[in-house]
């Protein structure tokens, strides 16, 4: 392929990446990570919107409380108890939802959503050492019109929670 054709293909791929409504990447939802969901009865939900995106998300009505409420409802529908604690203890697994984004020119918004289950784990090489570690995760990176980013992002979080619930049910039923 000539240099000019290669450059054109590269530009088209680059532009299609940024024009697409959303591009999805699964980070860690497989049979190995699903086994870590077996026997899970309760979770604490922690939502974190990174700065400076927090202000942009607030402008469109997407707050940590709104996300936490939506995630908690999905968990309760799956018969997983949600524990509300200010500072979650290591004994309670944490479903961590992280949201980051960037408003470009007021027209397009790029975002990253990650949902990860953190649980107490014991190091095999030293069973006296207990740590919180991620055992299951999923994530989405994408972009879309800034005017509808709140609803679109919440819809994607709901889809990701459906994936978590499906993984949980596969491991437990």
Kindly label every feature range from the protein language model.
Residues 31, 77-89, 170-173:
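Short glycine-rich, low-complexity/disordered patches
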Residues 25-38, 122-173:
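C-terminal/domain-edge helix-coil "capping" segments
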Residues 21-66, 166-173:
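A structural "domain/chain start" motif
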Residues 10-21:
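Bacterial N-terminal signal peptides
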Residues 1-10:
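Bacterial N-terminal signal peptides that target proteins for export
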Residues 63-80:
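Amphipathic alpha-helical segments
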Residues 41, 47-51, 71, 79, ...:
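Generic secondary-structure microfeatures
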């Amino acid at each position: 392929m000539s240099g000019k054709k290669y450059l054109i293909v590269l530009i088209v791929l680059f532009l299609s990446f940024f024009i697409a409504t959303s591009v999805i990447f699964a980070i860690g939802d497989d049979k190995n990570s699903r086994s870590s969901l077996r026997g899970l009865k309760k979770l604490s939900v922690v939502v974190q919107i990174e700065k400076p995106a927090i202000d942009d998300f607030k402008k469109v009505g997407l707050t940590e409380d709104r996300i936490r409420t939506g995630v908690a409802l999905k968990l309760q529908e799956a018969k997983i108890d949600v524990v509300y604690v200010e500072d979650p203890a290591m004994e309670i697994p944490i479903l961590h939802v992280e949201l980051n984004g960037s408003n470009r020119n007021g027209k397009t918004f790029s975002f990253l959503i990650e949902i990860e289950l953190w649980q107490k784990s014991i190091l095999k090489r030293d069973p006296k050492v207990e740590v919180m570690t991620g055992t299951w995760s999923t994530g989405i990176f994408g972009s879309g019109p800034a005017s509808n980013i709140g609803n679109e992002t919440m819809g994607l979080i709901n889809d990701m929670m459906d994936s978590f619930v499906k993984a949980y049910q596969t491991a437990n039923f």
